[in-house]
Amino acid sequence: MASILVDDQTKEHDTIKDMFFIFEIDGEDYGVEVTNVIEIIPMKNITKVPKMPDFIEGIINLRGDLIGILNVRKRFGKVPKEYDEQTCIVIIEYDQYKLGLIVDSVKAARPIPPQNVSPPPNAKLNNYNQFIRNIGKVDNSVKLLLDLDRFLEQ
């Protein structure tokens, strides 16, 4: 799988404002603001770090940068699955840190205009609902938009 890069010029362009990078976990579509995504890489060997929470898989060396790797499935409390050819790592930058998110598969960057975004229902339907900031409606489907602040809290 080739790396997909989001360069600084693209990040600053006005059309990027309502763009979300969509990925899949357990058959459901999730999104993060495309401005947080640096690149997508294939799975790599991950060095385990002792005494870390279960959802933190460890670290990788990416071109000289040490990147912490989080398993999104485990963070959501979902059943782990074997990595396959679709499994990849989405490298994000958040609060001046680079992190990697292991996802089942990547889809694409999609525009979701503000009028198609609404807050999630108040009811906690599952144990990962706390990580959802908004729900985006795209065509006839729903994209669950992550709240990175809550998702990255320990």
Per-segment meaning from a language model:
Residues 1-154:
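An acidic, low-aromatic, low-complexity terminal/linker signal
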